[in-house]
């Protein structure tokens, strides 16, 4: 890994100091987490959501999906969202995701949503995440001076 990073650094051209620049035909992703969460994810005990970088258990995953369904169902009108006759400013759409509204989302609605959703927005198993992205993937672990092991993972490649 150090050889590849050295080659990469040596071939970089400085355009603006302190800014990482890339051409628009490539894509990059990096996520850092503790090793125990990463291992639980790889073992199917947790789900990872690319959208917010959080890990979830099964219950948390279902809640994220239900919130996404409510956000999708809410009607946008002139800077506000309306759902079940409740109006909230667009920045406060999560106020529509009450426990009552979440509990009304059916299994059928969840299944329909999952058929057409953007996988970036829902928590995925490691296998689902790995299958979803057609880029090169990586995972690297590092142990800090205090003994904590951190894992960096993600994907990269051209977006042709």
Model-predicted regions and their roles:
Residues 5, 12-13, 57, 67-69:
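General helical secondary-structure elements
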Residues 5-7, 12-38, 157-159:
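Short, extreme N-terminal segment that most often corresponds to the first beta-strand
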Residues 41-60:
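Charged, amphipathic alpha-helical linkers/stalks
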Residues 58-160:
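Low-complexity intrinsically disordered segments
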């Amino acid at each position: 890994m150090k050889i590849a990073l050295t080659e990469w650094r040596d071939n970089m051209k400085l355009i603006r100091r302190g800014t990482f620049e890339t051409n628009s035909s490539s894509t990059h992703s990096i996520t850092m987490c503790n090793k125990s969460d990463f291992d639980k994810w790889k073992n199917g005990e947790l789900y990872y959501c690319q959208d917010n970088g959080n890990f979830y258990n099964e219950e948390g995953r279902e809640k994220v999906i239900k919130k996404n369904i409510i956000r999708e169902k809410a009607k946008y009108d002139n800077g506000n969202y309306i759902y079940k006759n409740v109006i909230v400013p667009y920045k406060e759409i999560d106020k529509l995701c009450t426990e009552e509204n979440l509990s009304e989302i059916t299994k059928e609605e969840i299944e329909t949503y999952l058929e057409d959703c953007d996988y970036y927005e829902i928590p995925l198993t490691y296998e689902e995440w790995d299958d979803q992205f057609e880029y090169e993937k990586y995972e690297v672990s590092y142990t800090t001076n205090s003994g904590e092991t951190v894992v960096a993972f993600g994907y990269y490649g051209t977006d042709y």
